[in-house]
Amino acid sequence: MSDLVIETKKLTKIYGEQTAVNSVNLHVKPGRIYGLLGRNGAGKTTIMKMILGLTPITSGEVDVFGQNIKGHEKRIYPRIGAIIEAPGFYPNLTGTENLEIFAKLRGTPQPNAVKNALEVVGLPYKDKKLFSKYSL
């Protein structure tokens, strides 16, 4: 079993004649925060969408929590999250309130999931700070 949270192996996406992502290998360790940097059109969003199972993979593999997601993409949804491009949060609610709404919408069964997620990234639980006041 891998000690990686996310691993991609030769991840590739081709749209017609255009290669959007070419043989990308990522290794994401637990407890760390990562970001993808690059110019417009570099394939960052496409990579994230392939990892999340939202865009079909042309070739290569994605393993999440040591398991290949091919054919089981929805199985990983309760355990992962991502902000792609612009966050879709309610500015008049707190960060905790936003996360609790999205956890319910996604059917996250763990009662402490939001609290645990906030602890991982070093944010306070039940903070009164509105999302509109967060710095992205």
What is each model feature region?
Residues 52:
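Helix-to-loop junction immediately C-terminal to a conserved catalytic motif
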Residues 38-43:
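Walker A (P-loop) phosphate-binding loop of ABC-type ATPase nucleotide-binding domains
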Residues 100, 104, 111-126:
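Conserved ABC ATPase "signature" region
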Residues 18-19, 74:
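Short coil-to-beta microelement around the adenine-binding A-loop and adjacent beta1/P-loop entry
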Residues 60-71, 75-76:
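Conserved ABC transporter NBD signature motif
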